[in-house]
Amino acid sequence: MALWERGAGGAAEAGEDATEEPERGLPLLPWDRFSAWLHCVCVVGFDLELGQAVEVIYPPHSKLTDKEKTNICYLSFPDSNSGCLGDTQFCFRFRRSSGRKASLCCFLDHLDRDLPVYLKKDPAYYYGYVYFRQVRDKSLKRGYFQKSLVLISKLPYIHLFRTVLKQIAPEYFEKSEAFLEAVCSDVDRWPPPVPGEVLHLPIMGVVMKLRIPTYRDKPGTTPVVQNMHQADAQISMTLPTVHEVDLFRCFCPVFFHIQMLWELVLLGEPLVVMAPSPAESSETVLALVSCISPLKYCSDFRPYFTIHDSEFKEYTTRTQAPPSVILGVTNPFFAKTLQHWPHIIRIGDMKLPGDVPKQVKVKKLKNLKTLDSKPGVYTSYKPYLDKDEEIVKQLQKGVQQKRPTEAQSAILRRYFLELTESFIIPLERYVASLMPLQKCISPWKSPPQLRHFSQDDFMKTLEKAGPQLTSGLKGDWIGLYRHFLKSPNFDGWFRSRQKEMTQNLEALHLEALCNENLVFWSQKHTEVETVDLVLKLKNKLLQADREHLPVKTDTLKKLQTHIRDIILALPDDLQDILLKTGTA
């Protein structure tokens, strides 16, 4: 079986030689490694007659629908009002066209399973990482050279791909297409994006060293990236993170309101970020989404959204309430189109955080007339929790003492993490109590069902085991929980926990079966009952593989041995039939 299916991401041509993935002994075809990291690389230019157009897609066999190409075209250029002269980097996210064949199979699914929930791929979306250049050029009719180099990927590794673009884009604009081919060939030599391993990624003479987090990592910690087999002299740069943004820089214009913003994101409230450029809008939206980590933000979010987006009508209609989505916009038109939205964040030009904004009060929505309105948060929302003055003082003190922005971001990240954990721990504790006891698991009965989630029962647990055990914040925690239980973020979190616990029950049931003397059981029962048992056990093995059940390898081997021993005790004609119906 190939390492992964060759579909939209990159199909090897017939007759091309396969290499082997040394650790797994699986065949690797050209562009398989590339497809693990990127879907494709696009160059978007400006044509006087056509407007924005995709000039190059690499590798050439990469598949994009016309709708996807149109979205990429408009999202890869700043709105004309942004006035982005020079080089600008930003990020966007867009829906994949429906009915597309998935390009990844079991191995990459396995990698995805080891990631923290907030880094798992969403198969319905692509990310676009943009390096846009606009410089004066009198030789061109328009008077400007305008072009974007865009990396399209399913992976939300913002910092990694931003770093890659910073390395390759300036040289690409000088050397053009042959250079792009060399870049893609380099990526096709990268190891798979295995969580938890130290990876060395060469790109045009530079070697990046990084580590992708795993779900086993303690939240809020970044394990030290240590050298494995590669000498220090060969490492050009070490990336401390693959996905994090500069939190403090993003929240600096509105940091008096960070706790309220955390509540709005947690509750999946409709939020729009109005910013002067795609760089500011995309970084702020990504910072908002990350502020409830390690919870996954389960609604849609668009770091940069334009009036040409295929979902423009869906998201701006006034015939229904605004959807649970976070939009980053720069076009002044949105100040009017989205003025019915309940929560609007206005971001000014992001400078290095040397000045603390003086504005403290939340502004009323009716005061937001245009995109030129003063920076601030425009909403009538009343937070459930009392304001934490300590974090504001701590950050203000950091500004006065000229504390590095990295340190300020670390303080802010730790604050958000502790707030989110204080909120989610009571829910985790209650949901864990819905799991049946191990003694209730019988090998001869179907695995027991999880108990039903009762909002009333959960609320009763908060009096003695609520967030007050880990947080000193006062306020209406009960009201916050009631609101959260109706949100898409709760729905996504609970579905994930349900799936995880159901798989644990299936795994425990499988272990219980393995601990039985199944051969002895078969000797006491009819041939029909024994054949039925064999088929059920084989289905259990298939389920364990298909659903990636958390079963030890020894348990699976033991079950295979049981199946084989039972079959060999049957008459020859039945042995032949059962041995042909799958591996025993």
From Swiss-Prot:
It comes from the Eukaryota. GO terms for molecular function: guanyl-nucleotide exchange factor activity. The keyword Aminoacyl-tRNA synthetase does not apply. Residues 371-504 form the dDENN domain. It is found in: Recycling endosome; Cytoplasm. One of its GO terms (cellular component) is recycling endosome. Residues 39-218 form the uDENN domain. Residues 1-23 are annotated as: Disordered. Keywords: Cytoplasm, Endosome, Guanine-nucleotide releasing factor. It holds the Pfam family Avl9. Residues 244-369 form the cDENN domain. InterPro entries: ABL9/DENND6_dom, DENND6, Tripartite_DENN. Its main location: other. Belongs to the DENND6 family. Guanine nucleotide exchange factor (GEF) for RAB14. This is Protein DENND6A.
